[in-house]
Amino acid sequence: MAVPKKKTSKSKRNQRHAVWKAKAATAAQRAMSIGKSVLSGRAQGFVYPVADDSED
């Protein structure tokens, strides 16, 4: 089984954690932006059914 030879330093651990947090923040920002565009009706890349009651 593979085991690390030395303990990872706090700075390396913090750097990796910061990268992970930055990626998560970017994904959250993108999701929020897409959600806002869908709710405001400005989204161009989504197709969803629209309830059309004029058929009666």
UniProtKB/Swiss-Prot annotation:
Positions of disulphide bridges: none
Q: What InterPro entries would the database entry show? A: Ribosomal_bL32, Ribosomal_bL32_plant/cyanobact, Ribosomal_zn-bd
One annotated GO molecular function is: structural constituent of ribosome
Q: Name one GO biological process term.
A: translation
User: Pfam families this protein is in?
Assistant: Ribosomal_L32p
Tagged with keyword Repeat: no
Any one annotated GO CC term:
large ribosomal subunit
Keyword line: Ribonucleoprotein, Ribosomal protein
Residue ranges crossing the lipid bilayer per the database entry: none
The family classification in the record reads: Belongs to the bacterial ribosomal protein bL32 family.
PANTHER family given for it? 50S RIBOSOMAL PROTEIN L32, CHLOROPLASTIC, LARGE RIBOSOMAL SUBUNIT PROTEIN BL32C
Read off the NCBIfam families from this record: rpmF_bact
Give the HAMAP family listed for this entry.
Answer: Ribosomal_bL32
The name on file for this protein is Large ribosomal subunit protein bL32
